[in-house]
Amino acid sequence: KKGIADILEDPSTYANHFSIVNGSVNSAADAIGVKANNRKYYSTGIQTKLDYHWYKGNAFHDVEIGLRYHYDEEDRFQWVDKYSISSTGVMSLTTDAIEGTDANRISSANAFASYITYKLKYNNWTFTPGVRYENITLQREDFGKNDVNRTGVNLATRENSVGVFIPGMGANYKFNNDFSLFGGVHKGFSPPGNQDGQAPEESINYELGTRFNLGKLQGEFVSFFNDYSNLLGSDLAATGGTGSLDQFNAGEVNVNGIELLLNYNFSNSDAKFSFPISVGYTFTNTAFQNSFGSANDLWGTVAIGDELPYIPKHQFNTTFSIEHKDFEININGRFNGEFRTLAGTGNIPNNERVDANFIVDLSGKYFITKRLSTTLNVINLLDNTYAASRVPAGLRPGHPFGIYGGLEFSF
């Protein structure tokens, strides 16, 4: 028995398996297993927010307080049917599996969150400190593959809890209507899985930037640095894992870079037609700060200084629009640089690389009334063939040429 990822990664070694999955031979019964990824989701909760602001002298004050409780649940009741396949590519059911004989478990989370933010505007300064508190209890009830009626005879449970304060601080100084500086320091947080003792993802995130106006040109430039003290990974089928959904701690990572956004309008403010253009660029640099061995395909064996996988160093996008009171047309170009699919440094090996791509999209909208409009979107206008990922199960193609139309109604 071999998974599709192993077969596609090395079709020469698994030639017999490959001939079965591509339908070039008449297989035996039960040669192919197809999993019914049956899941149900349930979510409920309540939240409230209180906002109060006032003026005193030259200062503006605003306080916001929020509370939220919610419960989320995922119910997996899955099975694997078995098939044979003919040399003409026709699959025939040979074993109709009993429902619930694969993943048969309920995962849930009870979460309470609260926050308070305070905004102070004084002369040219704006300060925005705040803090959030999260308290989460995560549970899993696994009934096992042999208890499809969920009597609990083989019930295995596990639980993990986390409580954390998440502070942050932002500041902005406005020199005039055309130029300002801003910065911030914020704690980042992502909850752990339901494995007992697993730590949450935590980071300290810094940013410093400027916003400016130069005539018709508007822009924003930001530098950022994210210091992860504990990065989380997930065992997902979508990332080449087993699909257990278990999370694992991947240690310390630094992420830094710059972002640039420019907007320009070629027309005057009183013109019937508007011709805006926007350009955005992001440079991202990543580096693990510790070494570890990982059985998860997303990381591989990691050494200090290795780059994070699936993060391109260079990303670029631009949009040009024609806007009128009755319609708008937008053409967008997006570039994603090459990226590695396993942690590493230096030149990226061919079998661990997803090449760069540039895709052009076209969209349009016609306003029938103030509330009703028709939309048209053309994805990958030039029908470029490109790879988007190497997981799950080898190279995955990006979206081919496609046309989508619809109606948009606003209340």
Model segments located where?
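Membrane-embedded beta-barrel scaffold of Gram-negative outer-membrane proteins
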Residues: 1-2, 180-182, 200-265, 272-292
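Structural signature of Gram-negative outer-membrane beta-barrels, strongest in the C-terminal barrel
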Residues: 41, 57-62, 68-70, 103-228, ...
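Outer-membrane beta-barrel "beta-signal"
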Residues: 209, 213, 261, 397-411
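Short sequence motifs at beta-strands and strand-loop junctions characteristic
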Residues: 36-42, 102-110, 119, 159-165, ...
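Transmembrane beta-strands of outer-membrane beta-barrel pores
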Residues: 69-75, 122-124, 133-139, 185-191, ...
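Flexible, surface-exposed loop regions and adjacent strand-edge segments
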Residues: 2-14, 76-89, 143-153, 191, ...
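Gram-negative outer-membrane beta-barrel transporters
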Residues: 56-57, 248-343, 370-373, 382
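Face-selective signature of the C-terminal outer-membrane beta-barrel domain
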Residues: 1-143
